[in-house]
């Protein structure tokens, strides 16, 4: 069985390579230098190829240099004019990490290479790609309909296309699925899981030593996947594992509450019993929402305020969820969910999720 694939040096494509080898494929990989800031991933890809060869798996590996063209593209991954956004993987600002038409370019090269292998070796060839469901929200070129359409276009534009097919084994899975399958593949192949994944890079903003930041959206998704399988990530982070895990869990909760209208558990938030002088700003956009002189201990388990800041202009929306009639409050600038407003005999009570707030210390 024959397969070609793109090996970025990240955990998704590395997991895919393990899967293909465990299933008995002869694999050829192409890694792309497209002017990405996180070029350390190319070194990690080479390190894993060397590790595989040392253990008896002769994987063909090529590197294509597209940097002279793609470094001109408008993206935080390639342009020094943009900072890499931080936070949850599905937050809107992560669209800055989209490289226009990247996967179409990569897939086109892979398709041409697959056809060449098919004709040279007189065999059918699978183009395997590590795209997964976690990519769908931000990256249109990681969605199944994209590959269905581009596969049809390539077939129309080439001879012998019946010998080439696309395989997207993780299209309905996520990074946790990739890691769980990689554990099985490593056992099958007699490889050390931690060694393989220490030789990967997922971070879009590693430091000069190649250590992962733990703060980019891709980092957060990876950290949560390792946490889900009950293992510490073997890759080196700038901060200790327990700290990057805490940060990732916080980013996940913040996204769930502010963008998906979830509620943090009572008595667990940072600001429930917090009574220092200062302002409470929206954790998403920074708008000042409340001031400490209006904060009081209601005993409900969430930060409570009797009034909003004079310029907050917090939105009030009727909420009929859970069989109740309530007033939801949202940030007027970024439309993030904050909590609810209750009108009680003692006066109004803004019941706010701590995770939605950032505190700015100082006298009012």
Kindly give the residue locations of the regions a language model identified.
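Peripheral terminal appendages
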Residues: 1-7, 11, 15-19, 23-28, ...
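Local cysteine-cluster metal-coordination motifs and their immediate loop/turn environment
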Residues: 108, 202-224, 280-289, 335-336, ...
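ATP-dependent adenylation/nucleotidyltransferase module used to activate substrates
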Residues: 1-193, 219
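Glycine-rich nucleotide phosphate-binding loop and flanking beta-alpha elements
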Residues: 135, 226-227, 358
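A short Gly-Trp-Pro
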Residues: 248-364
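Generic domain-boundary/flexible-linker signal
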Residues: 38-40, 72, 138, 230, ...
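Gly/Ser/Thr-rich helix-start
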Residues: 11, 36, 131, 211, ...
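Active-site donor-binding loop signature of nucleotide-sugar glycosyltransferases
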Residues: 66, 205, 307
């Amino acid at each position: 069985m024959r397969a070609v694939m793109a090996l970025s040096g990240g955990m998704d494509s590395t997991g895919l390579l393990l899967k293909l080898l465990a299933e008995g494929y002869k694999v050829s990989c192409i890694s792309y230098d497209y002017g990405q800031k996180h070029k350390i991933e190319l070194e990690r890809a080479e390190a894993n190829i060397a590790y595989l060869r040392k253990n008896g798996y002769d994987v063909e590996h090529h590197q294509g240099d597209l940097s002279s063209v793609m470094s001109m593209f408008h993206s935080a991954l390639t342009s020094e004019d943009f900072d890499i956004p931080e936070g949850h993987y599905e937050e809107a600002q992560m669209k800055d990490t989209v490289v226009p038409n990247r996967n179409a370019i990569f897939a086109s090269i892979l398709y041409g290479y697959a056809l060449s292998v098919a004709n040279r070796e007189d065999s059918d060839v699978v183009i395997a790609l590590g795209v997964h469901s976690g990519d769908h929200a931000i990256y249109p070129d990681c969605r199944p309909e994209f590959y269905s359409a581009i596969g049809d276009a390539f077939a129309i534009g080439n001879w012998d296309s019946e010998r080439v097919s696309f395989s997207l084994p993780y299209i309905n899975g996520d990074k946790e699925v990739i890691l769980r399958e990689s554990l099985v593949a490593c056992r099958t192949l007699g490889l050390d899981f931690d060694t393989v994944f220490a030789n990967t890079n997922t971070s879009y903003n590693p430091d000069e030593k190649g250590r992962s930041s733990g703060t980019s959206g891709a980092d957060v998704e990876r950290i949560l996947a390792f946490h889900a399988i009950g293992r510490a990530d073997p890759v080196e982070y700038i901060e200790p594992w327990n700290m990057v895990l805490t940060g990732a869990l916080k980013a996940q909760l913040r996204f769930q509450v502010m963008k998906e209208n979830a509620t943090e558990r009572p008595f667990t938030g940072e600001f429930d019993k917090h009574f220092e002088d200062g302002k409470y700003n929206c954790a998403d956009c920074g708008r000042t929402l409340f001031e400490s002189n209006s904060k009081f201990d209601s005993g409900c388990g969430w930060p409570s305020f009797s009034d909003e800041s004079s310029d907050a202009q917090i939105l009030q929306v009727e909420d009929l969820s859970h069989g109740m009639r309530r007033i939801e409050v949202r940030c007027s600038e970024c439309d993030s969910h904050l909590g609810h407003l209750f009108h009680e005999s003692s006066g109004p009570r803004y019941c706010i999720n701590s995770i939605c707030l950032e505190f700015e210390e100082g006298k009012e």
